[in-house]
Amino acid sequence: MSRVIVKGLPIYLEEARLRAHFLKRLQQQGRGSEDQITDVKIVKDKSGNSRRFAFIGYRSEQDAFDAIEYFNGSFIDTARIEVAMAKSFADPRVPTPMREKRREALKRLREREDRILAEKRQKQTKPQHGIDAEISKNKQLQEFIETMNPKMAAAAANPMARAAEQPASANPLLSALHGAEDDEEVDMFQLSEQESDDEYTDLHQRPQSAEEDELEEPAVGQDLDAAPAPDAAEDGMATNQEVSDLEWLKNRRIRIRDGEDAEAAPAPQEQAAEEPAEQEVPQEDEVSAEEAALTKIRATGRLFLRNILYDATEEDFKQLFSPYGELEEVHVAVDTRTGQSKGFAYVLFKDPEHAANAYIELDKQIFQGRLLHILPADAKKTHRLDEFDLKNLPLKKQRELKRKATAAQQTFSWNSLFMNQDAVLSSVAAKLGMEKSQLIDPENSGSAVKQALAEAHVIGDVRKYFEARGVDLTQFEKFKKVTERDDRIILVKNFPHGTTREELAELFLPFGKIERLLMPPSGTIAIIQYRDVPAARGAFTKLSYKRFKEAILYLEKGPKDCFSREPRGDELLEGDAAPEDVKEIKKSVEDVMDADSKTPSSEATAIDGPTVSIFVKNLNFSTTSAQLAEKFKPFSGFVVAQVKTKPDPKNSDKKLSMGFGFIEFRTKEQAGAVIAAMDGAVIDGHKIQLKISHKQSSLPKTSKGSKKKISGKIIVKNLPFEATRKDVFELFSSFGQLKSVRVPKKFDKSARGFAFVEFLLPSEAENAMDQLQGVHLLGRRLVMQYAEQESDDVEEQISKMTMKMKKQAAVSKMGALRNSGKRKIDMSDDENDGLNGF
């Protein structure tokens, strides 16, 4: 509950001032953002005057309780206010409104009227043949009817035929019998004193004059159109001298259709007016709105949410509804022009029953300071083919449609930076200025190694490109194990070499605004970030496994928190900015330097405590540690700079640069300022790349709990069975001096699918692990990890050997126990021994 009610407000108080008054408490706590107060509503009457109470919604429940504790009993001007937790409509403690009470009373009254009307109709629906049967039983009544109306004597002999030819209201006596109650006795011979026999003798005679027609009721057999209108006496047409006889005759003329009997006219006007009331069909019992909503939700499993925050995200609703069941989709409607939320959302459950439970529990409840209004939503429109339609398609088409339908649930967790091998080779060949056929010699056994090295080179360039543009590649390794992904980020893979950035933009722009598009110069992979989630979701659904040129696009959703900064420069799609030259970068360095940074710091100053290290990549191999320090000394907080080197195998007295190094600063803020200023700067003709290193300090540590030493031995898994020791040696020897390479084999001389590679230095093993990550050899992705390093401690080695011997002894003992329970039995001897007693 994060919504409070404020009572006793001044009648002149406005919502803006009330919001500002309650925002003061959040400002005192250092959280003065207006987003923390989600809703302010002063309740007013029909005339627009304040009813002196209001509702205030908070984003968090903790802020709501703090506001109650702080503001309850306080004053706004001279009015003492009362602050308490608001109740939702679903709270049983809330009294029933008068409107709801009136609705229930009207419903009960309508049900009572329908019941009385049904009983009355049931009594009035007595069959016509029942009246005829009573007349046929009473001979005196039959004689009376025949005497008064000789023309109906023949019809009286056949009551059923007479009932079919003559309407029920043709005889006043029959009408009296027809309208009588079932439980009352009707005397057939008792007539009213005002009635006489003349009414029956003149039943089928025409009226004698127009005056009598106006005063008396029309005869039963006369047509209603022939009867004078009620206002005939008022218009005075008969006495008007200006009206000719012909006009008066035309006014009195009636029309009789062919085959229509004049006597079979409808009932009199008064009776016709009463018939609609008697034939009124009662309304059916209306199903309550609650039951109708639950029925629809159980059919669709989809909910429509209203009155939500405009900055509410899909994650907020996933956390709210996921406890009730597994969710299939959460969609917040977004305006495609502005990118802002429209204030409503849809939630789709896999099980409709879970959706019904969520509707019962959460409808009209308080969420983020607002009353959440939930309605049943229509079923989502899908264009999927059913199983019957799929069976009529070719098998290849069936697989293609099924793969495209399940694309959103599939993940390439085995390699996020997957690249088309043909595109990789084409990129390397174009970079070297040769044909692809010249790069790979089909007659050479080392072609697979060359292809793997080419892929490693391209992957290295792609990593450098992404890291320079704020892509956190560590998230790609984390999200293999975690299912959380960002729906706005799409990884585009497997497109042909030569695809340009403009072609990808043209393909993805129709679905919505693109916030960022990253495509390395190698042109083997791309990352697209949409502004809105619905746009990215639509592009992913429509373009997954779509044929693009001569290849098929592979799309994958990117990990959460993939980007460490906002897009800028050439990352934006609106217009690629020209890359800044070195001089401009140097100017930006001077802007971020402190005033005292030009004064060289004393190198002899001792640094106490941990420092922050910056990892520098893509250094020129001729750049030394002194030259690197000269570039970064002007920055405040500089400690030391070092270029990593390795021994020269040709000359043991010399060392070779490894192309990267580390720079240490006193604080993280100083290191961040240096990265913002120098990332992408040019040193000795190389554009360097900077990022925070996980290694926090290069100072020696005397602590026993220091990090375990990195091993120089690597175990290579998922190795192709066709790969030989020579292939493994050629692949890894490019990254350092190898000490040993071992490919274990089975008893039949076939490979076991893994190998051990040991480098001379642990740093070389680390470099190989970094460069060969995600590389394929003979179509298989190599999986590498450090092998367990042998301990230099003699006692530890002795304990390991002791444990190994104990394990072997236990295995031997268990084998002996199993064998002791087995012995050879001669069944023939046993049978003979059993028969000796007989």
Curated annotation (Swiss-Prot):
GO terms for cellular component: 90S preribosome; nuclear speck; nucleolus; small-subunit processome. It comes from Eremothecium gossypii (strain ATCC 10895 / CBS 109.51 / FGSC 9923 / NRRL Y-1056) (Yeast). Keywords: Nucleus, Repeat, Ribonucleoprotein, RNA-binding, rRNA processing. Involved in pre-rRNA processing. PANTHER family: OS02G0815200 PROTEIN, RRM DOMAIN-CONTAINING PROTEIN. Residues 272-289, 828-838 have a biased composition (Acidic residues). The gene is MRD1. Residues 195-219, 225-244, 260-290, 813-838 are annotated as: Disordered. One of its GO terms (molecular function) is RNA binding. PROSITE patterns: RRM. Its main location: nucleus. The keyword Magnesium does not apply. This is Multiple RNA-binding domain-containing protein 1. Belongs to the RRM MRD1 family. InterPro entries: Euk_RNA-bind_prot, Mrd1_RRM3, Nucleotide-bd_a/b_plait_sf, RBD_domain_sf, RRM_dom, RRM_dom_euk. CDD domains: RRM1_MRD1, RRM3_MRD1. It is found in: Nucleus. One of its GO terms (biological process) is small-subunit processome assembly. Residues 2-88, 301-379, 488-560, 612-695, 712-789 form the RRM domain. The keyword Flavoprotein does not apply.
